[in-house]
Amino acid sequence: DGIYAWSEFIPTGGQYGNSHGSYWWGDYGNTEIEFTPVYGMFGAYGGHAGISNYVGSDWQNEGNYSFDLQAYNVTGGHSGTNFNTYFGYLDESGYGMMESLPPFYFWDGEARVIDHMWVTNTTYVYNQAHSAGFGSDYVISDESTFKIVAYGYESDDDTEPTVAEFYLLNVGQNFVTEWTKWDLSVLGKVTRVEFNCVGSDDMYGSYGMSVPGYFAYDDVAVQFPGETVFR
């Protein structure tokens, strides 16, 4: 309560998202998007990382959970200093980090088109997607992939969401290493969007997905009727 500047959410004592807890936020008077972390096996942190301005490229030394708020190989946000980091995934192993996927939603219940957002990898994912532990013998190959899947819901009763995908790691060991535009207009009008992180089969071991379900994002652009510029 009482926090009005995005930068006030950023921890000053380290780059570990869990050290400052999870929180909800709302972009009121602009995109009208609200976000609430979900609760699961690991508490509130099961579905949130946090707002950040931490960046770096030393993926071998800073590619662990202590740097989970760090965007990889960029100099700041897509436009400006700050950006957001997302954590959350569900799989069929029973070891997923939460019981439901953390969503964006329009707080007023109006369905709108989210035109696009800008995304990139975190240093943590870049490291772990090369070679991860966590109950797995995974080592990157030319067939390894890691993607974000977005599910768009037009209403609370919608049981058949529209889907969009974005590959943070594509075949041929092709990583995203800069802010990249992700077209979400294919989802159509939505009241909420849920995100999941999904790896190729080789990334799964005894405890589910061995690569952490993170990505960094910025500048979520929303279409409003009668306006020619995205908010």
Language model segments and positions:
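N-terminal targeting leaders for non-cytosolic proteins
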Residues: 1-102, 109
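Short secondary-structure capping micro-motifs at structural edges
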Residues: 99-107, 131-138
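Extended extracellular/luminal ectodomain segments enriched in beta-structured repeat modules
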Residues: 109-116, 189-190
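Short edge beta-strand/loop segments characteristic of extracellular beta-sandwich folds
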Residues: 118-120, 137
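Short catalytic/ligand-binding loop motif for oxyanion handling, primarily in non-cytosolic enzymes
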Residues: 122-127, 201-204
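Short acidic, Gly/Pro-enriched loop/turn segments at secondary-structure junctions
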Residues: 125-128, 228-230
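Short coil-to-beta strand junction motifs in C2/discoidin
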Residues: 128-148
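Terminal, low-complexity interaction segments
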Residues: 145-230
